[in-house]
Amino acid sequence: MDKIVAKIAALGVPGLVLVITIGATGLAGGAAITAALAALGPGGMIGGIATLGVLGLISEGIAKYGMDAIFSAVVIELYKRGETKESILNKIQKYPVSKDLKRRLRESLEKVERKEE
């Protein structure tokens, strides 16, 4: 059942985003779809389609691993790619997440920093 829920979430989120954007355009039919896709991403309709694809991948990852694990992996990858600890801490501070998750992200950064030494 978990696999089914993950697939529904991965397919459902981009669809929901598109439906909401179509509703926000105030248009109907093909014009609504065109306007919604153009509004979703950079570069017009093609960018909107790409944005929905990326949104699908992200939502599938969140459904499979959880938001905490995804955020933690991103913080660790930023460090491995050479970003400074200070710049990563600034990014963590700006993330729209709970204080508890920010604390865990800082702890993840500390652990990976200790392993690198």
Can you describe what each PLM-predicted range is?
Residues 4-70:
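Small-residue-rich hydrophobic membrane-insertion segments
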Residues 62-117:
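Amphipathic, membrane-inserting segments
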